[in-house]
Amino acid sequence: MSTPAIQWYPGHIAKAEQQLSRHLDKVDLVIEVRDARIPLATGHPHLDRWLKGKQHLMVINRRDMVTPAAREAWEAWFKGRGQRTVWCDAKAGTGVKQVQQAAIRAGDHLNERRRNRGMRPRPVRALTLG
């Protein structure tokens, strides 16, 4: 006799994806946090499709857990794909200021676009996930 397949996992994921999609419609900037030890495995394969052209800042945390050579290789890999990244170690506070500055720059860019279209600047709505 075979064991029955677990059915709660796909439904759980589908529900979370629907909720995320609703939240993404309301934000200007998505700050995605990934693990430096496995940066590809800690990203969602459908995130680019969900972003629909929104500004995206990738924060790679736990930079202290990888060698400088590995960090440089990953940085080059992401840069080659047009993805801006900020490396940090949230536990030690290293790189957190750079994350803040990158988010502020993204907000400035958003408000510049709003001004060019005759709209007033407003606070940036950001979503952090990962």
List each model region and its residues.
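Active-site flanking residues adjacent to catalytic metal/cofactor-binding acidic residues
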Residues: 34, 60-61
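N-terminal accessory targeting/assembly segments
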Residues: 1-52
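Canonical P-loop GTPase G-domain recognition
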Residues: 57, 63-129
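Short, contiguous strand/loop micro-motifs
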Residues: 7, 61-62
